[in-house]
């Protein structure tokens, strides 16, 4: 029997967790107070995280926690605590951006499942294969991958997670420095100011939003994703309201 593709919903608050579960999500992803690529979301302290996991598990919904920002050396102790908080809350997996964070998580909690974040910029068969060989259970692939590239990557015995709805960045995930350059707010630290959404003059065009891409929506192709072996259909939007 063909496996049903997982519907993975975002949650920036407990209200969003409840909304996702009631709407039929198979899993939710959310961030702790630190090391989340959506630092402006409410996010979850230890008690809130435990409450969210308890509520989700009662309804047979999985919870994945994001630790997917660039991490500096002087933050290692807080990072260790973040990993242990997630483990104590009994989350189902960590979504990580940094290989050092992945190694640390393996050392602290060997049984923890690891998902490679889209911030790793995995956009090829070889990238997916490398992460599988490193022991990752799932890879969140770049939004830029084509159907042909996804089909090839799906041959590797690792779960693939694909964004099916949400905003598109002008740059490959994990590679954009636009916000950091213009306003000292790094998207790779969870603080993107989204300057690409502003109007710019380009050549003879003196106004317009040349760098602001239309939203991504491949929901009509979910059946095709399932047929090629994609494990999870991911909805972007931890900054969005519950409704």
Feature map (PLM): residue ranges:
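Active-site pocket-lining/capping segments in soluble small-molecule metabolic enzymes
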Residues: 2-122, 140-144, 149-232, 239-243
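Anion-binding and metal-coordination hotspots
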Residues: 136
